[in-house]
Amino acid sequence: MELFFCYNEGRKIRQENKMSEPLFLHSVMQEKIWGGTKLRDEFGYDIPSEKIGEYWAISAHPNGVSKVANGRYEGTDLASLYAEHRELFGNRPEPVFPLLTKILDANDWLSVQVHPDDAYGLEHEGELGKTECWYIIAADEGSEIIYGHNAKSKEELRQQIEDKNWDALLTKVPVKAADFFYVPSGTMHAIGAGILILETQQSSDTTYRVYDFDRKDDNGNLRELHLEKSIDVLNIGEPANSRPVTVKADDLRSTLLVSNDFFAVYKWEITGKVDFEKTADYSLLSVLAGQGKLTVDGKDYPIQKGSHFILPSDVEAWTLEGQGLELIVSHP
């Protein structure tokens, strides 16, 4: 809590308390050809159609900007808040809010795709590239992802794509709930049907499609592919997944899922009351299971499965309390 004083001709005339507070968010649903209803069924979100594929839970990207839902910044969009109150984010140097947290409901296969790195993305698309990672919230039995490819050179890669030799080219991996995958830029990938994922990524919406299963949109048209750009940016060699590291202390089990130049991502499992102190300029938190409360500056905030919030830089300490709470936490 910070104390502020107002003065008039050298006399103190008023005193007020400015309390630190979390930033809860109203966010944007994205309809997708492969989407479904699990965002409603699993999280209770009000979805506008039966084909909602993505919930951009914490986003300042212009294609889906979150708005603050509480406190003195209520109604302010996250992009404006970041631009006008950089002190809330540790006065970090990134010119735009650098991260995006989304939940994806893959009712059908997503396209086989790849994302560029920052240099290629800025040169060709005018925005950042995309390195991302996936935490599998739920997966139907037998669900798979595509994670990498088998080509040994760019020439072989091009030939396999031109020949549409997908079975030989693409690497399929079975998945289950609580699996984690690190997907750096340049990785061939696709999320399979029946999978619910929390994705942490750079704030970018650039995707190059390699293959889309020859399906058509609502107007009967095939979706655009981006073969030349895909071949430009695809890595050769197997992707290297991260090696999560878990530590247990009292009522907290904390797993570092990945740490790189763009973000660090953790899974917190809480079975009681845990006090925290700030170790990052700001943090993004998503509740995937359970319910409980967040306490900041003596004020309690109820949280439950489906809650998403930011702890800005002025929140020096906080408490999380609940049974069976599971959160994904990230910071730049």
Predicted regions and their residues:
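Short beta-strand segments in beta-sandwich/barrel cores
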Residues: 273-275, 290-295, 308
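Short, structured beta-strand/loop micro-motifs enriched in basic residues and often containing a Trp
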Residues: 159-167, 291-293
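Short acidic-glycine-tyrosine-enriched beta hairpin
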Residues: 170-182, 297-314
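An exposed, glycine/acidic-rich loop-and-rim segment of catalytic or binding clefts
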Residues: 163-169, 180-182, 188-239
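Ligand-binding loop in jelly-roll beta-barrel domains
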Residues: 96, 104-109, 118, 128-129, ...
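Structured binding elements
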Residues: 285
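Transition-metal
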Residues: 2-152, 214-240, 265, 326
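C-terminal amphipathic alpha-helical segment
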Residues: 208-275, 279
